Amino acid sequence: MKTNKMFMVLFAALAMASCSNEKEFADPSDDPVNEVPDVYASFSINIPHTSGEHSMSARATDPGINEESTVKSLHIFIYDAASPYTPTVAEFTVAGNTLQQAPGNTSKWITNHPISTKKADKYIFAGINLNTDIVNYITSNGLGAFNYKEFAQEVTQLADQTNGFVMFNDTYPAITPAANLYEKKSDAESNHLSISVNRVTAKAAAFTSPGFIVNGGGSMTDLKFGWRNLNKKFYFIQDKRETLIKDYNWDNYAIQDFSRGADAIGVYSSSDTPSSFSYAPENAFQYVSGTSNVDGTTFISISGVFKPARIITTVNPSPSSGADFEIKDNASPAGTTFYVVRTADEIANYFIDGSVAQQYADLCIAGATGMPPFHGNYVLADNTYTDGVCYFHVFVNGDATTPQAPYNIYRNQYFKITINSIQAPGNPSDNFDNNKPIQPNSWIGADVEVVPWEVIEEDHDL
């Protein structure tokens, strides 16, 4: 698959740092590196572009928003490939006029001079729009920071629409031989080393299809979406060392590894151009069918305000049989709290009065005359739809194949979710499936496609 890129040509001059990433430092007077000549390197940084045309479906392409491709700063981290892994680090910024767009090319960014380092085989890393916490961690830990050590940071910092989205190398770099570095600045300026980077977050948007329908006897308004169960930590470089892409919590996780997520963005119509997206860090875990838990995955929450068309009321304040209830049109406005009694005949019975719902359920359980059967206990609080809000969960990427795993989300992917149908009333709480195995989407029908950043579309019936 082709992915459109922005090209940033980097000509960066760096002072050689004297420290290494090891706990014990070499004596500079005895360090043979001091006798090695200076060399130079320039770079082409390939940044994924949000406005490219790339889709696995026949749907229109998605331009994204400008903030997703904003470039504010660039850090280059160079390390000797041999111990003590001597570092060379430099920062370039647009505000400081050391990083600028190439004339006539909005996809290319240029620094104003090459990077100077000592001649040796090197590991070279590029970081775009890095915040202070990330930079400090890398400079303190040296090359070890890139050796698949998890780093904690909130998604609002990784997908920062003011300071730019964080990006790193799209794969762990191979060693750059010393012979590929140049002893003349002019040679370095003419022969760029190329590095591709990816955003470290995934994004999502939800749309209703042209034929979107609400089943369940009522109307649905104010549909919203957002990622839930977001990873708190991530690797700077995606772990592709084995057959499957892995995360730090691949085969073991704790509830505290995740934050809940609070995005509630309005669902778009099929013809809309989205202006807001929900973002989430990568979450690559070992999926086992029937065993893997919802608490270990990152998923999309869909909510909506449901108004039942018909409700059950009582004609007797002390009902004793089915004859004491009647079905009426619901005259309450949208956003009114309602209650549900799901009977054994798989019918969702709606109520506006909670006490009536409880009476109805009690008589069903007791097998009263004219009442449908109800098995088990009824808890009114668990069937209360406050302000009419109901929830559905969409587990994306269920058909993923190697090197991806089912229900995993990966950096630089855009999950475009098309909702075809919803089976109301859904669930009264967004936490309805906590500590349960991941199940196929049953009350929401949606298609989801996934493509590196530009588009991954999925259709769902909820």
Residue ranges and their predicted role:
Residues 15-18:
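C-terminal motif of bacterial Sec signal peptides marking the signal peptidase cleavage site
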